[in-house]
Amino acid sequence: MMKIFTYISLILMIFQSSCSTKLPEIEGMNYDAWVTDKYGCRGERMDLVSLIDINQDKFLRYNQNEIIDILGRPENQTLFTRSQTIFYYYISYNPACNGQETRMEDEQIKLEIRFDALNRSKSLYVHNYVNPLKK
């Protein structure tokens, strides 16, 4: 009986570890804070976006489901030409944030991640943002 329990436990551990997405290792990055700061209303995304921007290459090997595991569900997504998908994560100035300054859609700070037709992340861009970590 104990042998069966050991085998079942081992199988469950292997299954669990194979289903989780490995987070990109970035010093100072708090993924939980990013996910819980919807639309950037608490300002935590503004503190973290520079780390994502400077480490873009670490986010370019993931598919859409893996990006959702890492950064949470995007606040907006668009289907683009040739079956490309674009995820948008808002950083600042979104109307969903009550009591804060808002701006028009094209003036908001937001993270854009583009996926190709094969569901691979191909580019990452932060709109209306100058990264203080880049020189």
Label every model-predicted segment.
Residues 20-135:
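Residues within mature, well-folded domains
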Residues 2-10:
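Sec-dependent signal peptide recognition
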Residues 15-18:
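C-terminal motif of bacterial Sec signal peptides marking the signal peptidase cleavage site
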